[in-house]
Amino acid sequence: MVVWLKQPDGSCVPLVDMWKPRIHVGGALDDLLNLQPFIPTCKFINKFEKAGDRERSKVLEIEVENESEAQTLARQIFRRGGYSKYRLYDVDIPSTQMYLYSNDLFPLAFVQAEPVHGRIEWTVKDSREQIDYQLPPLRTVRLQISTMKSHRIQTFEDELNTITIQIRDENIVLDSGTEPDKLMRLVGAFRKIDPDIILTESGDSFIFPYLTRRAQHHGILHEMMLGREEVPLRIYEVQGHSYFSYGKILFKQTAARLLGRLHVDETNGFISSDCGLEGLFEVARTCIIPLQRASRTTIGTSMTSLQLYHAVKAGILIPWNKNEPEEWKNGNELIVADRGGFIYEPQFGLHESVGELDFSSLYPTIMRDMNLSGETVRCPCCPNSTNRVPELGWNICEKWDGIVSRSLDILLRKRLLYKKYKKEASDPPTRLRYDQRQAALKWILVCS
């Protein structure tokens, strides 16, 4: 794992940690013992297999090199068990996130790092709870290009016209020389400026794929290094993917990554385009999700990251390809329980003395205060709980704080404070900063 640290003097240094991700395998003890000889790197440990479990189970822990090996090995184990003997865990969690969870780190945290025998010992001198936290000195540039279009729509075959690098109010325009000259001057400018954050519009879908293709056309792709590591821009064979969300088929471009730098494509991300960099930083810190991932994923993914963190810290395994169905309800229970779609018709006409009630994060607050989570409603350990679901009478756990309620707590508390400080702020920049942060947290709470 390569971790980039931004030092107080503005310089950046890479640290290499020999940490490796781990996957876990559950099943009957005899089946696990039969599997053990085929995987020399495995060992038995005790973990909770489900969030609602009260006793730990004996599972196999297997150290793998990377996410690709984790997926391959998981499929082999699943197939070896006839697709029924073994339960796989912690297979599809991004290794960067698991590294943060395992070391109690979060993006942009103020830390002290000490290399020890190939590993890194971390001392965190920061807290996700902080409101007025200090960010590292980050250099931000905006990258734009224009092409000599031969068609109405830009293509990778169009010749490069100009490259513009915007730093605050200054524009650096690269428009002279041949096309290879412009590309190499861009590489030189990045080395000289050494930006931490590169802002683009359509950087994932066009700018960086275009620059890569033009460099390849001129045989200089191996010199096209825009990141901090000596790695050239990459040509992706598969550009993006489609996915289904809320009744729509959507398309997301493959992220263009510049190793050691953060690339934010404002057309391929929601939080940064709606809440600015301050909102993006707040989500990454609070939800413990890498900045590059937070800038492109949905708000649900950020919320999931926070829940995964609490599960990992509680010793709960994360199932692979989770498909646990909702508990069965009869018709009457469904009518009483599922009221989310009910809309009350208003009375038409002109009304006077009308009042308005506005609840701040109503549903997330109810879920936190009433301890509503998948493993706490109708739990087996508290059948006589005084905390019940109205009308249905279902018991809610009194012994265990649910994963959902734990995750919502920090979001609700911080958003309330940001709204308070926003009202009290006297200068517009401070007020805007608090507003962007609370707005970002509001979006995360929407998907709870």
Question: Across the structure, where does each feature detected by a protein language model lie?
Answer:
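Short, conserved beta-strand segments within well-ordered enzyme catalytic domains
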Residues: 61-63, 355-356
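Charge-rich, low-complexity segments
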Residues: 63-67, 373
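Short glycine/proline-enriched loop/turn "hinge" motifs that connect secondary-structure elements
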Residues: 53, 133, 155-157
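Conserved acidic
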Residues: 3-5, 25-28, 139, 151-448
